Amino acid sequence: MAGALLGALLLLTLFGRSQGKNEELSLYHHLFDNYDPECRPVRRPEDTVTITLKVTLTNLISLNEKEETLTTSVWIGIDWHDYRLNYSKDDFAGVGILRVPSEHVWLPEIVLENNIDGQFGVAYDSNVLVYEGGYVSWLPPAIYRSTCAVEVTYFPFDWQNCSLIFRSQTYNAEEVEFIFAVDDDGNTINKIDIDTAAFTENGEWAIDYCPGMIRRYEGGSTEGPGETDVIYTLIIRRKPLFYVINIIVPCVLISGLVLLAYFLPAQAGGQKCTVSINVLLAQTVFLFLIAQKIPETSLSVPLLGRYLIFVMVVATLIVMNCVIVLNVSLRTPTTHATSPRLRQILLELLPRLLGSSPPPEDPRTASPARRASSVGILLRAEELILKKPRSELVFEGQRHRHGTWTAALCQNLGAAAPEIRCCVDAVNFVAESTRDQEATGEELSDWVRMGKALDNVCFWAALVLFSVGSTLIFLGGYFNQVPDLPYPPCIQP
């Protein structure tokens, strides 16, 4: 008994399913036996088919700056009314939805006008849903690669304005009319819809605004009614953290190394030039990396490229400064003469302004000792010539402190033997040579000090130029924000 009851229930279930399939099949034949998918669903030729459009973004895949290509994954919701597909579910056992292959139904043939890969249509021809009353809905997925003119002026602190332009490839503005869909609250969805639950956030770009608009272009003549475009705009802002960590910070640190060349001695011009040129080479590598990222355009120079060019110019100026300082530091009195004006500026004025004045000279220098030794030699010569003791000579020298003893000494030396005069001449020559060497050494020291003063001035100038220039360049990128447009945010918080 129980087995018979179970068998009866199974038969009823199979019969019900078969009956349901038969009802859908009957509905399909009822609707499509005399249906022509090539004809517009209008009763009169002058009537217009109203197309309701809704674009849902599921993933902003990428923006290729080099190729200026935007890749997006979307769902395109297209709804319209087809009077030829009108039916009542009461006549077909309550079948309220009929799923039909898209090639069996008239389609408005909406394509992406600004695609770049030749794929105008959707990625997958999903089934069309036919509802009671002749309402038709089609929700195909698509992956579009569209053109997007990239503005690289503030790269990597930039934002881009990309568009998705949809148009009916076959029908003009008088044959089909586009309107935006309406949500459950009755609000018009005049923007790209983003389902936060299904949306995958991009790691490089953030979507700020995604408004939509419908624009009708009038034809050039009365016989051409014109076209209608549905334009969705994606205003996206770059997330610069990747470029800050991997390019900007290393570039700033390497560029700052060029200032360390000033901490080398003024005479070490070769080492200073080596440091600066190595920094130049490193900056060239960074500039090459940026050139591989941005599009090949002459319309603008990216912010990061401008910064690299700026620091390369600073490094070049530092190399020139090192050469000039080395040239000044190695000058000698035999090749160059120092003007009093230049000496006053470089040895007195600039060191005092920069706080690098040399320590005051000790009054107890070696000159009096050398002078005393010279006087001692002369007194010894006179003692030998005149056969007088040293005490008497010193006593006489003290009596004639105003120079009378020098005159007497010269008179006595004039009458001395030639050998003694030769010795005195030799001593005078040695003393004169010593004085010349001391003067030359002081002159060389002055040239070195002047080179050091120039080096200090150029260091502070390079430091100020590097700091102010870097700050101004990057502040331009910081203030490059997306303007407050009269659109609601694309993704509601």
Curated annotation (Swiss-Prot):
Keywords: Cell membrane, Disulfide bond, Glycoprotein, Ion channel, Ion transport, Ligand-gated ion channel, Membrane, Postsynaptic cell membrane, Receptor, Signal, Synapse, Transmembrane, Transmembrane helix, Transport. Disulfide bonds join C148-C162. GO terms for molecular function: acetylcholine-gated monoatomic cation-selective channel activity; transmembrane signaling receptor activity; transmitter-gated monoatomic ion channel activity involved in regulation of postsynaptic membrane potential. Residues 1-20 form the signal peptide. Glycans are attached at N86, N161. GO terms for biological process: regulation of membrane potential. One of its GO terms (cellular component) is postsynaptic membrane. It comes from the Eukaryota. Residues 21-239, 292-306, 481-493 are extracellular. It is found in: Postsynaptic cell membrane; Cell membrane. After binding acetylcholine, the AChR responds by an extensive change in conformation that affects all subunits and leads to opening of an ion-conducting channel across the plasma membrane. Belongs to the ligand-gated ion channel (TC 1.A.9) family. Acetylcholine receptor (TC 1.A.9.1) subfamily. Epsilon/CHRNE sub-subfamily. Pentamer of two alpha chains, and one each of the beta, delta, and gamma (in immature muscle) or epsilon (in mature muscle) chains. The muscle heteropentamer composed of alpha-1, beta-1, delta, epsilon subunits interacts with the alpha-conotoxin ImII. This is Acetylcholine receptor subunit epsilon. It comes from Mus musculus (Mouse). The gene is Chrne.
